Amino acid sequence: MRNRTLADLDRVVALGGGHGLGRVLSSLSSLGSRLTGIVTTTDNGGSTGRIRRSEGGIAWGDMRNCLNQLITEPSVASAMFEYRFGGNGELSGHNLGNLMLKALDHLSVRPLEAINLIRNLLKVDAHLIPMSEHPVDLMAIDDQGHEVYGEVNIDQLTTPIQELLLTPNVPATREAVHAINEADLIIIGPGSFYTSLMPILLLKEIAQALRRTPAPMVYIGNLGRELSLPAANLKLESKLAIMEQYVGKKVIDAVIVGPKVDVSAVKERIVIQEVLEASDIPYRHDRQLLHSALEKALQALG
């Protein structure tokens, strides 16, 4: 009997945020509605941060980025969604997609309803779920015991991070937990380690679902050195250990990394190590190479 391929899977779930999650989702977009992205909602910088400070609510920027990368049929709607205002006025720097999502959030009962309306408008088949539907921020405690609030400030830290928390304490979106419970394969990464990947794992319902799922879990590493100094100083095995510390169990079965990563200390996990970088954008994963690496990981997992 042949091993399963990605095309055989009924439910693939990817966790993360930023450009990394969007890249993974677009590389697997052929799965259509069998693909689900669970998206980080703690961003407080840029257009997203301005909207949150003015209007409250969850962070929409990472969700918009994922939607952008899943658009396969360019249209007036998709051009509007991707439009960013220039100039020096009040709208300068704002992304229209963020504003559209925020407006639909006001008109909807739940943020998830707003996302589904936009998915239908943009003809995106993959499901996208915010990690929580409640406003929440990331907080770090550094090795001096200082509390640092918000992704922007955490990214600027120069001292090691000792602990991460979400503030306030919010529940995970129930559909996100259900997606993990039903998954045949779970993927986390690539993305900024402390500010794109870790926030999702801080939700107790998500951590519990990851502890209980029989689905294999694959970590995809970044291709370049992170700008965040605390994250940049972490070795691969340390990142895996930190993620599993917060989940509460050894859950990562395979890792996919580039050829320059030191994997010598990674034990008892499948390692897929090969060229993954796109030729047109430095430090971004090539969609086809990433898809191929995920196929190899799935084959190795059996």
UniProtKB/Swiss-Prot annotation:
Entry keyword NAD: no
GO cellular component annotations of the record: cytoplasm
SUPFAM superfamilies: CofD-like
Chief subcellular location: cytoplasm
GO molecular function, one term: LPPG:FO 2-phospho-L-lactate transferase activity
Compartment(s): Cytoplasm
Pfam entry (one): CofD
Keywords of the record: Cytoplasm
GO BP: regulation of cell shape
Family, similarity comment: Belongs to the gluconeogenesis factor family.
Known role: Required for morphogenesis under gluconeogenic growth conditions.
Protein name (database record): Putative gluconeogenesis factor
Source species of the chain: Escherichia coli O157:H7
Upper lineage: Bacteria, Pseudomonadati, Pseudomonadota, Gammaproteobacteria, Enterobacterales
Gene name linked to the record: ybhK
